[in-house]
Amino acid sequence: EALPEGANEQDEDRNDTGGAVYVTVDTDWLGRPKSIKYTYSSAAPVGTTVDYGPLKVLVVASKAEQGLGTWITHERNVVEDYKQLFGGSPDTTPAAVMMWGDSNTVNGVSTVDFDDILFLSGPTSHPSTTASSDER
């Protein structure tokens, strides 16, 4: 695993990422895809959002908070993230999902592994959080 040194999603000239999942939901009035980029950042802290017009970046993991070489599990509510980032509900279900790692703007190295990506409709809970104390 490797994160691109010098990358920073908050700087358009250095916006490479260690790893990202893009979820494209809608298009804007010009027909450009409206996407959320869930990213593992080399520099920005978890919770950072960046606005590149129809592309919204949301940092869900960061080099500062979590080490390399460890599987990281994330659960996101894409509809709620969309509402917060774009200011309204999506008109459609996701049209595309893309996994990505890049280092071209900083001429570095980015290596990422993805596994077990699952999209669910409706309210869900992680199985480990659904049992009450008397059910165990």
Role assignments for model-derived ranges:
Residues E1-A43:
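Secretory/extracellular carbohydrate-interaction modules
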Residues G18-V21, L68-G108:
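Extracellular beta-strand ligand-recognition surfaces/modules
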Residues V23-T27, G101, S121:
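Residue-level signal for short segments within beta-strands and strand-turn junctions
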Residues P33-F86:
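Extracellular carbohydrate recognition and processing domains
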Residues V97, D115-F119:
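Extracellular beta-strand elements of beta-rich domains used
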Residues G122-T129:
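Short, charged low-complexity linker/loop segments at the C-terminal edge of domains
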Residues T129-R136:
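Compositionally biased, proline/threonine/alanine/serine-rich low-complexity intrinsically disordered stretches
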